[in-house]
């Protein structure tokens, strides 16, 4: 899917100065942020204020790739009004199930490394086949 856009969950925490200005002069800051999103190749799908929890704003934004999402993150953080921000790739349930299937096919048995100076850990032996006798 070369032209598909990836969805990202964006969580934003304003700093105290930004909140002070928003309380004194309420405004929709997304009017200022939308052009930044667009210059990074994205478009806002949904945005909401969050009044409980660690973040103040949650948004779903589509970007062409992770580099565009990273550029958006850097641009916003450089602006000075945000003290913390998370940008996380979202996947649909269907995509997640495909990934789970891939992980199941690729899994291996993990055994921790041996401490220095000790004998290497023994790998689990495959069970003997039924009907085969040991001598």
Predicted regions, residues:
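Short S/T/G/P-rich N-terminal loop/turn motif that feeds into the first structured element of a domain
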Residues: 1-39, 43-45, 49-54, 93-135
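Short hydrophobic/aromatic beta-strand micro-patches
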Residues: 13, 58-62
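Short linear sequence elements within intrinsically disordered, low-complexity coil regions
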Residues: 19, 60, 68, 77-78, ...
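An amphipathic, aromatic/His-enriched active-site/gating alpha helix that lines ligand/cofactor pockets
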Residues: 62-95
């Amino acid at each position: 899917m070369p032209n598909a856009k990836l969805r990202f969950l964006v969580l934003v925490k304003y700093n105290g100065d930004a909140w002070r200005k928003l309380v004194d002069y309420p405004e929709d800051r997304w009017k200022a942020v939308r052009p930044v999103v667009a210059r990074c190749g994205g478009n806002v799908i949904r945005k909401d204020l969050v009044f409980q929890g660690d973040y103040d704003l949650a948004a779903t934004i589509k970007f062409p790739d992770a580099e565009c999402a990273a550029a958006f993150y850097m641009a916003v953080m450089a602006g000075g009004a945000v003290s913390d921000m998370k940008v996380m790739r979202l996947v649909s349930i269907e995509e997640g199930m495909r990934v789970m299937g891939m992980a199941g096919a690729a899994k291996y048995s993990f055994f921790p490394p041996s401490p220095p100076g000790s004998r290497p850990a023994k790998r689990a032996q495959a069970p003997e086949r039924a009907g085969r006798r040991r001598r």
